[in-house]
Structure formats: structure tokens, C-alpha cells
Regions:
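Switch/connector loops and helix/strand junctions flanking conserved nucleotide-binding motifs
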Residues: 125-126, 222-224, 242-243, 257-259, ...
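Low-complexity intrinsically disordered tracts that form flexible linkers/tails across taxa
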Residues: 365-378, 757-763
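Short, intrinsically disordered, charge-balanced linker/junction segments flanking boundaries
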Residues: 791, 796-805
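Short, small/polar-rich motifs associated with maturation and membrane association
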Residues: 1-340, 344-347, 353-355, 359-361, ...
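Acidic, glycine-rich flexible loop segments
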Residues: 372-405
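Solvent-exposed beta-strand/loop surfaces of large extracellular or lumenal domains
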Residues: 60-61, 218-219, 460, 705-713
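Extracellular/periplasmic, surface-exposed regions of secreted and cell-surface proteins
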Residues: 140, 187, 193, 270, ...
Length: 805
């Protein structure tokens, strides 16, 4: 046989042997790999979608579908790591004999509240170094609530919710850590799903998933000129992978005046008729409970319907909420319908994500005369509601109580408004840890109010007006654009994060107002205003306005922690506002905070009953915008008339001095805090001590003329100080598989003081503020150096009679 044939035979044989060996190896590998299938459920048997199933030590992983099922190919004998937010992570050992897995995850109580929303992002609760209180849906105030603010009742130390009236039209007033301004805004900034400047009345209480309250300066400084009064960040129910489900909730509530003011009865009043100390007492021969005549037991109802579903790539949530609330004062009510839809879509293994949220609310509400309750308390209890002819009884003079029944029945005051919030967000994650997002948002508010008085109203009986009509219509459009990039990276025990962003906000507010009196008939109500005699005689009042306002901001934040033991955060915002003077349109708002997690130290690590113990310190500077435009500019207003060229011509005169140095009020705050958790989170809480000073307070001051054109001027002068301590304590008294009973308590103490009202240029010792309604007509408060804001000022009781009257 030739040699070349031998070589060919040997070469072919070697190739054949190689192919056989490779085939055997593939068959061996295939024989070692198996498909494992299973389902993941919670302790109550509910399937869990979106659970991460990962082959331990590899990048081989899958997620459960909407029914909680999964399938993964791996080598038998390896382990699976099963993780899900809010549940204890499990490690499952596999084998070749069992390829069908039924996995149960237990709820992790300590992790349920582990994510806290901060400005333009979120952090683990253990890494937070500022004074932030996070309240989740499971911990909201139970029962029917009239407004979303009420969900926080008793849950946040330092947050004061005030309801001064039974009027269902008015919501709750909120203040955080005292009053920080004399003439600017005193309410916290509301951020809804990332949109700043929202209103809680625009959303349904049932649609809220969590509320995070940013209380101190180091937390709120990232919001710049709007963070002085704190920030409330609301996250609504979000679309996520889950089985399609439909939920309906309904509730009914009753409300009444629980305790009436202790006033004289008709018999008590009659006994004073012959008392020389009380001249002018008149016994009109009847017994009338005026408060009872204008009040009622109010019935309210709420209906909420929601739909949600979708898979890991595309999911949705939609809801509709209807509320009807009566007020305890007759002819007061509020009716609203709110609809929401949220859509999520993820592409390219979650590297590209889209979010769309639309929330629309329509409200109609009816008001009663603002001083009805006050006049009911002041009215003569022996006076009848109607005279013998069926007409309302009236004193027919000013500075006497008005018949509150007539004031309610003969006045029409109805308001309707629509609030629309829309936002779209796109997020790109090109590499691990890096997220680049762009968000565009639009908020639109349209309102119309119509008010009229009949011929039987006090204004006709006393003043002879023969009907009054007021009509208001206004519209506000807010457009927001935000670009945010954040990057997180861990190097062993070193964890760092960087965030930078840009924000642009454009507000456009416009409206019209008209007033007239003297109807030929009161059958028209607030309509057909053109038929009023005032319109024909050119005595009616009409006006319109338009205001625009812009905010431009650049902001950033750096975070670092070493082994989640030593933590540091610094942020900075550079913001410009069109409302301020030419010399101070831009400002810097820095913040820094640090934390030490003592429970991570070796000397406390073996203390089994201690879950977490963290010390915090933070300092931040925030600003407070003025509430109006053009306050820094030289303005002219219409003045008197002059007879020029054969006709009367209205002139113009200066009414506001320019102030190019007008700027925002500035608040600096130092906060010391301690967070703790014991006994596997059965007992947890926080303690905070703070010191805040608001300087450059805005107020109007008298100035000499000349050199000034007008005798008053808006300027930054005063200073307010707030100091206080806050305590939040939460405990789980009962915790079983089917029952959990939590107790939460808060304590807060705030000492407020007006430090100064004057400086070298502007002087003012005090001024009066607030007023009572008719017929008393006097001031109620005084603003004075050394006093707290809101200090009452008025007459004091001199003495009591022997009868205690």
C-alpha cells in the first residue's frame, strides 16, 4: 500500500474518533442538564409573579410569570436562589429525581418597609441619613377618609393636620415642624409620581401606594426653593406583572357635630333682661336653637373600582373612584369622580422602559355662607327664624348678627373644577447600574365658580342690593420637563451612587372675574348677568388676568456607604425663578448628611434582640418662593378720572416700588436623629431633634417718599426660628399567620419664635393679622418680635357675674 494512502486512512480514522468523542461529550452534557419547572407562592397560597429564580453563582436566571410559574434549565444538584421584594430569600437544593418544585416564600416583616423614596430616587431604609418618615399602604389610617392627607393622621411626628371647619369643600391644612413664613407659602411641596407641585385633591386615597415625608433640610434641599416647608412624596398604585384582577370597595359614613359650644339657652338669655349689667337684652318670645337650624347629620359614600394585570414586559393598572360627601352645615357638599390609568412596557431585557400615567379628577362642590356658624352662635336664642308672615327675621342693620338660616337658604355658591395630570417617562439602562431617564409632565386645572343672592338675602334686606352675582373662571397649565441620570456601583464593601439632573417648569395662570347687582328678578340665579341693571348702567365690575412663572434647576447628589455601616450624602441644587429681582434670580441650595449604623459594629453585632440602631446628622439649606408674580417690579395702576379733550379719561399712577434685590426666603436647618428597631421589628421608631432658622422673610414695609415713589415696599427682612423634638414609636402587639395588630404613637414639640422684623433699612415693630367675620369685625392675631407666629390678640375676660355669666 502506498504511503500516502496510509496517511489518508490514519487521518480519516483520527477525525472519526474525534467526532465520536465530541458526540459522546455532548450526550454527557445533555444528560447532565435538566428542565426544572415549578410555582412560587406566599404563605397563604397566593401565587407570586415576577419572582427572581437564579442558579446560584451564575447568571442563569428567569422570573415567574403572572401565575407564579417558571421553567429553568440547569444541572441537577446545583442550588436555586429565589428572591422577591418583601419576602425572605430562599435557597433550594435540586436533584435529578425531583424536577417539579413547589416553593413557598415567607413574608419578611423587616423588609416590607425597606425602600424609602427620596428626591429623584429611592434608598434602602437602613441607608437613609435624613429625617424621612415613610408610610406604606398597609399602615394608612383605616376607615373612610375625606382626603388623602388624613391617611397620615397620627403616623408622622411633626406633621400637623388641621381642620377648622365642617365644610366638606375645604381640605386639611398641613404644616411640618411649625410655620416658617409670614407672607409666603407655609404648606409642604406635594410630589405625585415624580411630578412636583401637585394637589392631593387630584387623586383618590385608595390609589395611593406609599407616602414619604421629607422633613428636614438635608432631605428637602434637593427641591430648592420649594422645599422649605418640607416635601410630601406620593407614589400611586403602579402597574406591575400580575394576574388580571378586578377589585371593588365601598363605604358609607355619618358625621355630626359631636359637641356644641356652651352658649346661653333661651331661658338663660331671658333672665338677663332685667339685669342692669346687660342693657339692650330683648326677649322675642320663642326658643330657637340656631346651630341645630343650620346643621344636620351628614351622610357620605365612596365607591372604588380598580383593574390591573399584565406580564413582566407589559402591564397596566386602571381605577375609578366616586365620592359624595355632605357637610354638617346645610347646603354644603362635595362630589367627585377620579379616573386613573397607568401603563408600563419594558424592552430589550428591561434595558428600555416606558411609563405612562394619566389621572383625571372632576369635582363639584357647594358652599354655604362662611360666617353661618358664627352668626348662629351670636344670634338671640329667643328670636324666631320666621316672622308671622313667613319672612325671615332680620335686624335690618349692620353690626348685628344676620339670620344664618336666611344666609344659607338664599345664597347659591357652586364651584366645579377639573384637574388633569399626565406624565410620560422613558428610561434607558445601557450598562449595569446606570439609568438615564427623561420625563415630561402636564398638569391642567380648570375652575368655574358661580355665586348669587336672592331678594330675600340680607344684602337686599339691609343694603337694598336686589340680588348680587359673582362669576369666576380660571385656568392653570403647568408643564414640566426633567432629565435625570443616576449611577450606582459597589466595590466590595464600598457602595456609591451619583445622580445629576435638570428640571424645567413653566406655569401659565389666567382667569376672568365679573360682579354685578340689581336684578329685575331673582329667578335667574348667577346666570343672565347681562340683564342686571348694573350692567346697563356701567356699574358692574369685570377684570381678567394672566400670570406666567418659570423655574429652571440643575441638581445633583452623591451617596456613599462603607458596608452599610458608615453613610454619607451630599446634594446641591442651583435654581432660578422668574419671580425674583434682577439681582437674585438664581440661588444655591446645598445639603449634607451622614449616618453611623451602630448595629453593624462588632460590639453590637451579637446582641440578638437588636435589629437596627443608627445615628443620623444632617444640615441643609432650602428656599421659599413668593406666592405672586411681579412683586419686584415697578407697577402702575388705574387711578382717578380727568376731563381731557371733551371726555373723562382714566389715568394711571404708580402703586408698587421696584425692588431688584427681592429674593426667596432662606431656611437653614440642623437635624440630629436616631433610628432603632428591636425584636425582629416588633418595636421600632425614631427620635429627631432639630433647629431651623428662616431668614430674609418677605413682608411689606413703609418707606419714605421721596426718594421712593410709593410709601410701601416688599422686602426681605425678618427672621423666624423653630426648634423641636419628635418621637415616633411603632409596635406589633400581635403577629400570627392570619392576624397582625400594630400600635403607632407620635410625639412632637415645636417652639416657634419671631426673632426679628427689622433691619438697618426697614423698620417694623408689629402688625395685626387675621379678622373675625361680621358682626364683630376686629383683628384676631398680632405679629410681633419675640412672639410665636399665630399669637392670638384680642379682648380678655374682665370678670364673671355671681351667676357665672
Amino acid at each position: 500500500m502506498p504511503k500516502f494512502n496510509q496517511k489518508r486512512i490514519i487521518s480519516g480514522t483520527m477525525r472519526l474518533i474525534t467526532m465520536v468523542c465530541m458526540l459522546c461529550m455532548c450526550q454527557f452534557i445533555t444528560a447532565q442538564t435538566k428542565n426544572f419547572q415549578g410555582v412560587v407562592k406566599d404563605s397563604k397560597g397566593n401565587t407570586l409573579p415576577g419572582v427572581t429564580i437564579l442558579e446560584t453563582g451564575t447568571t442563569n436566571g428567569v422570573s415567574t410569570d403572572v401565575d407564579g410559574h417558571f421553567e429553568i434549565k440547569m444541572n441537577p444538584g446545583n442550588t436555586l436562589t429565589v428572591s422577591y421584594i418583601g419576602y425572605v430569600t430562599r435557597t433550594i437544593q435540586t436533584n435529578a429525581n425531583t424536577t417539579s418544585l413547589n416553593i413557598i416564600l415567607e413574608e419578611d416583616v423587616f423588609l416590607l418597609d425597606d425602600v424609602v423614596v427620596v428626591g429623584y430616587g429611592s434608598m434602602k431604609k437602613g441607608e437613609v441619613t435624613s429625617a424621612i418618615t415613610s408610610v406604606k399602604k398597609d399602615n394608612f389610617l383605616a376607615g373612610m377618609v375625606k382626603s388623602p392627607e388624613q391617611l397620615l393622621q397620627g403616623k408622622v411626628a411633626g406633621l400637623q393636620l388641621s381642620n377648622y371647619t365642617g365644610d366638606p369643600v375645604l381640605g386639611l391644612e398641613m404644616t411640618i415642624r411649625g410655620v416658617n413664613s409670614l407672607s409666603g407659602n407655609t404648606s409642604p411641596l406635594i410630589v405625585i409620581d415624580g411630578i412636583p407641585g401637585g394637589s392631593m385633591t387630584a387623586i383618590s386615597s385608595e390609589d395611593i401606594e406609599s407616602i414619604d415625608v421629607l422633613k428636614d433640610g438635608s432631605a428637602a434641599a434637593i427641591y430648592g426653593t420649594r422645599g422649605t416647608n418640607g416635601v410630601i412624596v406620593i407614589t400611586t398604585n403602579r402597574a406591575k406583572a400580575t394576574k388580571m384582577s378586578l377589585e371593588y370597595n365601598a363605604s358609607v359614613s355619618f358625621e355630626t357635630i359631636s359637641k356644641h359650644a356652651d352658649m346661653l339657652t333661651a331661658n338663660d338669655y331671658r333672665r338677663l333682661k332685667d339685669d342692669p349689667d346687660f342693657p339692650g337684652i330683648q326677649d322675642e318670645g320663642t326658643t330657637t336653637d340656631w346651630v341645630d337650624a343650620i346643621s344636620r347629620t351628614a351622610v357620605s359614600q365612596n365607591h372604588f373600582l380598580s383593574l390591573k394585570g399584565g406580564n413582566a414586559q407589559s402591564n397596566y393598572v386602571a381605577s375609578i373612584d366616586y365620592r359624595k360627601r355632605e357637610g354638617v352645615i346645610n347646603k354644603t357638599d362635595r362630589e367627585s369622580i377620579t379616573a386613573k390609568i397607568g401603563l408600563n412596557h419594558n424592552m430589550f431585557n428591561d434595558k428600555l422602559r416606558f411609563q405612562l400615567n394619566i389621572n383625571d379628577s372632576y369635582v363639584t362642590q357647594q358652599r354655604a355662607w362662611y360666617a353661618a356658624y358664627l352668626n348662629a352662635l351670636l344670634e338671640n336664642p329667643t328670636r324666631p327664624i320666621y316672622d308671622e308672615n313667613g319672612n325671615y327675621t332680620e335686624y335690618k342693620v349692620n353690626l348685628k348678627p344676620y339670620n344664618p338660616v336666611a344666609m344659607i337658604n338664599e345664597e347659591y355658591d357652586k364651584e366645579g373644577y377639573n384637574q388633569l395630570m399626565m406624565s410620560g417617562k422613558m428610561t434607558i439602562s445601557p450598562i449595569e447600574g446606570l439609568n438615564l431617564s427623561v420625563m415630561g409632565a402636564l398638569q391642567r386645572f380648570d375652575r368655574m365658580e358661580n355665586k348669587s343672592n336672592t331678594f330675600k338675602h340680607m344684602s337686599t334686606v339691609v343694603n337694598g342690593d336686589y340680588g348680587n352675582v359673582w362669576n369666576w373662571a380660571d385656568n392653570t397649565l403647568q408643564k414640566t420637563l426633567e432629565l435625570v441620570g443616576d449611577y450606582t456601583k459597589s466595590f466590595g464593601v464600598h457602595n456609591m451612587g451619583v445622580m445629576a439632573g435638570y428640571s424645567y417648569q413653566d406655569d401659565d395662570d389666567k382667569g376672568i372675574y365679573q360682579w354685578a347687582k340689581d336684578f329685575p328678578t331673582d329667578m335667574f340665579g348667577p346666570w343672565n348677568i347681562g340683564s342686571m341693571n348694573d350692567m346697563k348702567d356701567n356699574k358692574a365690575a369685570m377684570t381678567s388676568y394672566r400670570n406666567t412663572h418659570k423655574l429652571i434647576s440643575f441638581f445633583g447628589r452623591v451617596t456613599y456607604n462603607y458596608d452599610e455601616k458608615y453613610m454619607f450624602m451630599a446634594s446641591l441644587r442651583r435654581e432660578g425663578s422668574s419671580r425674583f429681582g434682577d439681582n437674585h434670580k438664581w440661588g444655591w441650595f446645598p445639603a449634607v448628611s451622614a449616618g453611623w449604623r451602630l448595629s453593624k459594629e462588632n460590639f453590637l453585632r451579637d446582641v440578638k434582640w437588636l435589629d437596627d440602631l443608627k445615628f443620623r446628622v444632617g444640615y441643609g439649606v432650602t428656599g421659599n418662593e413668593v406666592n405672586a408674580n411681579l412683586l419686584s417690579m415697578y407697577l402702575l395702576g388705574y387711578g382717578g378720572y380727568a376731563y381731557i379733550n371733551g371726555k373723562w379719561t382714566q389715568g394711571a399712577a404708580p402703586y408698587q416700588n421696584p425692588n431688584p434685590d427681592l429674593k426667596w426666603e432662606t431656611k437653614s436647618e440642623l437635624n440630629l436623629g436616631l433610628d432603632f428597631s428591636f425584636l425582629k421589628n416588633r418595636l421600632s421608631g425614631s427620635i429627631d431633634v432639630y433647629h431651623r432658622v428662616t431668614s430674609d422673610l418677605l413682608s411689606t414695609y413703609e418707606v419714605p417718599t421721596p426718594p421712593y415713589i410709593v410709601s410701601s415696599m416688599m422686602a426681605n427682612v425678618g427672621k423666624i426660628r423653630n426648634r423641636g423634638i419628635e418621637l415616633l414609636l411603632s409596635g406589633t402587639a400581635i403577629q400570627t399567620r392570619d392576624l397582625r395588630f400594630d400600635i403607632t404613637g407620635t410625639f412632637s414639640y415645636n417652639k416657634n419664635k419671631i426673632v426679628s422684623l427689622s433691619n438697618g433699612l426697614y423698620q417694623k415693630d408689629y402688625w395685626y393679622a387675621g379678622a373675625t367675620g361680621s358682626p364683630i369685625q376686629t383683628h384676631t392675631h398680632i405679629v410681633k418680635e419675640g412672639d410665636p407666629v399665630g399669637n392670638f390678640h384680642g379682648f380678655q375676660t374682665h370678670s364673671l357675674t355671681s351667676d357665672g355669666l
